[in-house]
């Protein structure tokens, strides 16, 4: 998407969304604690395998990035039926060239002697910056904290764009719908460029996410190689790199599990167990969530030393991983959260609550207290889309799916995504979906906030 289109969208949304004052406006200039309920997130990850290819983030040399093949230091994991792939990398060019291109290939080979069909159930890919017409790209634009999406995708960065495409059920034109691979050798499913020609600085990135279904077991690998600018490496070149077992250099040796002191999470290069977290956010021992419990929050993408005092680590475990890389999928990047809030008003009068995704400072949050600060001037911790079904629309009626793009900074409350008003004894199921995007820093919290009755008529629908 062009810069001008997104900037126009930003201006439009800033005009058409009624201003919602921050709940931090009345606070002091320094950090403050909000006392409330903070519960572990109900539900769990599924067991779908996800190839997590994120180490190195910055690719500095050709070679195999991640391989499940049995030979040449591969992880020896066959993928059969449903599996996913998450790949996120950056390329900073060559010092001696101004127009080099790094190419990424996804290779696969059947275990047996029969051809295999791979269906792309859904997926997308995006560059940080496009250098040619037709390339899906999403620059890191300075978007406002909240933008309501209409018919045009809103994105800031490739991870944000791909996450939004997955929520919308859209697919980048660079991706096929189905791939058939012959036995006996590795075949390229995809070959995608990371170009830097004409960019200043020489820096570009690509995010790729695929949800796949294989008709029979296959081995899969991701490989990086230089091409002749616009000409990708040949099939023979890809196979030679895979067969030789040449490795692209890794980065960030992780702190061993269970160690004390400073923790280096590192990045993932392995096979992750779990691609979707599904849960119903009801009260313990009940099938509904009493809205009188608000404010109440649940962590999203909680991790080691980032559980916000809930003692819950949502991080997906790894079935196996490359030596010297992360030992768990810290951050759950690419994981979809599909959450249901069965809201209920047991009172004899109308009650209104608001839904928000927030980014408290994990360094000062624990034991039912979330630390925030006014001003929204800290580093960006989350940039990406979220989908909510069941918010109030006209006349308080529940709306269908609404999608928003958020840019949240460290210690930022809200902003509110919308409100839910319930009559006495009324219930409503609200659904929240997000794909945890690349370029975010966990954790965040999903929050149900109380709203004064006099303010319950605000509607963010443009």
Q: Model-predicted segments: where are they?
A:
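Sec/Tat signal peptide C-region and signal peptidase I cleavage site
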Residues: 20-24
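Activation corresponds to long, low-complexity, non-globular regions
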Residues: 26-56, 219-303
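Bacterial N-terminal signal peptides
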Residues: 8-17
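Large eukaryotic, non-enzymatic subunits of multiprotein complexes that serve as scaffolds/tethers
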Residues: 35, 43-48, 105, 128-131, ...
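A broadly tuned preference for mixed-charge, low-complexity surface segments
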Residues: 157-178, 249-274, 395-416
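Long compositionally biased, domain-poor regions of proteins
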Residues: 25-27, 61-121, 125-126, 132-136, ...
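Bacterial N-terminal signal peptides that target proteins for export
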Residues: 1-8
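Intrinsically disordered, low-complexity linker/loop segments enriched in Gly/Pro
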Residues: 127, 140-201
């Amino acid at each position: 998407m062009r810069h001008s289109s997104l900037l126009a969208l930003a201006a439009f949304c800033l005009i058409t969304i009624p201003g919602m004052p921050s709940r931090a406006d009345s606070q002091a200039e320094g950090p403050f604690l909000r006392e409330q309920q903070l519960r572990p997130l109900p539900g769990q990850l599924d067991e779908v395998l996800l190839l997590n290819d994120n180490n190195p983030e910055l690719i500095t040399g050709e070679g195999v990035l991640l391989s499940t093949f049995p030979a040449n230091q591969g992880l020896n994991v066959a993928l059969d039926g449903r599996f996913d792939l998450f790949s996120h990398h950056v390329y900073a060019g060559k010092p001696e060239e101004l127009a080099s291109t790094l190419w990424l290939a996804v290779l696969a080979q059947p275990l047996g002697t029969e051809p295999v069909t791979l269906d792309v159930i859904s997926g997308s890919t995006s560059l940080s910056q496009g250098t040619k017409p037709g390339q899906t790209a999403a620059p890191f634009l300075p978007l406002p904290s909240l933008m309501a999406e209409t018919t045009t995708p809103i994105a800031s960065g490739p991870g944000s764009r791909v996450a939004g495409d997955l929520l919308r059920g859209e697919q980048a034109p660079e991706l096929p719908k189905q791939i058939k691979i012959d036995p006996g050798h590795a075949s390229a499913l995809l070959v995608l460029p990371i170009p830097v020609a004409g960019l200043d600085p020489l820096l570009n990135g690509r995010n790729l996410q695929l949800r796949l279904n294989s008709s029979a077991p296959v081995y899969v690998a991701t490989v990086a190689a230089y091409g002749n600018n616009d000409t990708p490496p040949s099939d023979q070149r890809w196979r030679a790199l895979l067969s030789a077992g040449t490795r692209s250099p890794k980065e960030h040796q992780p702190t061993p599990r269970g160690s004390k002191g400073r923790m280096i999470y590192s990045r993932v290069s392995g096979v992750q167990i779990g691609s979707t977290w599904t849960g119903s956010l009801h009260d313990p021992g009940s099938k509904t969530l009493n809205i009188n419990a608000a404010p109440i929050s649940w962590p999203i993408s909680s991790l080691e030393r980032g559980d916000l005092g809930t003692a819950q680590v949502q991080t997906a475990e790894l079935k196996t991983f490359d030596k010297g890389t992360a030992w768990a999928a810290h951050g759950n990047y690419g994981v979809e959260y599909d959450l249901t809030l069965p809201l209920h008003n047991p009172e004899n009068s109308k009650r209104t609550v608001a839904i928000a995704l927030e980014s408290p400072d994990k360094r000062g949050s624990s034991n039912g207290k979330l630390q925030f600060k006014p001003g929204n001037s800290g580093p960006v911790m989350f940039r990406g889309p979220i989908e909510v079904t069941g918010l109030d629309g006209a006349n308080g009626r529940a709306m269908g799916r609404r999608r928003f793009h958020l840019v949240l900074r460290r210690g930022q409350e809200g902003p509110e995504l919308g409100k839910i008003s319930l009559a006495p004894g009324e219930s409503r199921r609200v659904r929240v979906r997000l794909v945890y995007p690349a370029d975010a820093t966990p954790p965040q919290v999903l929050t149900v906030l109380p709203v004064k009755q006099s303010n319950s008529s605000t509607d963010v629908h443009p």
